Amino acid sequence: MMNLESDEKNLPQKISEDIISFILNEHLQPGDKLPNEAHLAKELNIGRSSLREAMKLLASRNIVTIRQGSGTYVATSPGVIDDPLGFTFISDKNKLVQDLLEVRFLLEPAIAAMSATYADNNDVHKIISLCYEVEELLKHKKDHTQKDIEFHTAIALGSKNLIIPRLVPIINSSIPLFVETTGNVLKTETIETHREIANAIAEHNAIKAQDAMSMHLMYNRRCINSRQK
């Protein structure tokens, strides 16, 4: 006998798989907007309420991002949740900050060099724009955390490496912790090193980008070490 309740529960899952197939078949990229609800429901031959349930499921898996009043977009790092390594549940935040910094030293200078090598004009424009936005927020003593995260994410995407964007949560998880730990005392250093990183990537100078990112992280380490003594 058919289990109608089970089929009903599985429907959003089945539709979500169809949406993923649609994204892949249409070659939609991270940040691209999906068709509107009416168009997509017609395309997939499903009801709009079922489509909404499937979209909520995909949003919970960080495959799409739903922006109220704007639409639904392919997530920046599809399928990568915000805290895949469970940093939230690590109680020793001082140790966490130090260890995240070590990992960032291993990853980010090389990522910046790759971005300088492979970033296209759109990537460069995004990185420069975000650099400016972070700078303006810092100058006006406003919270720059989210734009800082977007800046480092844009650099990772500029590498054109399929794996690196999936490492972004490691970087993103550390930035709010670093901002909290340093207390924004590194305003000048952040502005200067962000500019150097962005300009090096715009110039496609891999060595300069790598050195600038290393210096950026070095300032953070020095400040964090002095505050944790």
Question: Which role fits each region the language model picked out?
Answer:
Residues M1-M2, I207-K229:
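C-terminal effector-binding regulatory domain of bacterial HTH transcription factors
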Residues D82-L85, I175, V179-G183, R221-Q228:
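Short amphipathic alpha-helical interaction/hinge segments
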Residues M1-L106, A113:
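Short linear motifs at protein or domain termini
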Residues L100-F178, E192-H194, K208-Y219:
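Conserved amphipathic alpha-helical segments that form helical-bundle/coiled-coil interaction surfaces
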Residues V185-E189:
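Short helix-capping and inter-helix turn/linker motifs at the boundaries of alpha-helical repeat units
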Residues I20-N25, A156, A198, S214:
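Solvent-exposed, non-membrane alpha-helical residues enriched in polar/charged side chains
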